[in-house]
Amino acid sequence: LTQNAADVCREALQIAKQKGLTISADMNYRSTLWNYGRHPSEIMPELLGYCDIITGDIDTADTYFGIKTPADLSIENKFRFCCEALLKKLPAFKIIGMSFRGANEVQQPTYQCAICMNQEIILTPVYTIPQTTDRIGSGDAFMGGLLFGFLQEQNAKQIIYTAAACGVLKHSMEGDFSIISIGEINQFIQSGPVN
């Protein structure tokens, strides 16, 4: 966007932190928003330093912080490696959540989520998504589930399973937002990874 936008964000984050508010951020990198002469690594690390809850992905951790997660690791070990490196750069965070997309042997989309909370790492099972209506907004749904779980004072496992349910269920809805009931989330979690 612009340097002015970054400055306003910094000021808002400082005020929110002074007021004791919980601050969340989706650190996904959008290259089309960075056309004003500064690299995101010059702006985002400082802004993310104010945040308590962060979602994102391994590639963005590299773009913002230079974290080179080895590609040959399992998803769990990639997440662990990235979180350990992020913790050194963002020591104040309470939760980091990530979702991982893939495909199974018959090329159906898969979705798995991970959380780091209180230095505990938990992964969900791998969910197969046999039919996708629209995946746009699934990251926002994932973050919504993460925030909901946090605000409900769920434990780390409950939070990441809630977030995963929101992310997976969004794939069945048209448009870039989702409206999911708590009953639907709980039913999804109880039915397990074959959904």
What are these language model-derived features?
Residues I122, V126-S191:
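Conserved post-catalytic alpha-helical subdomain immediately downstream of the catalytic base
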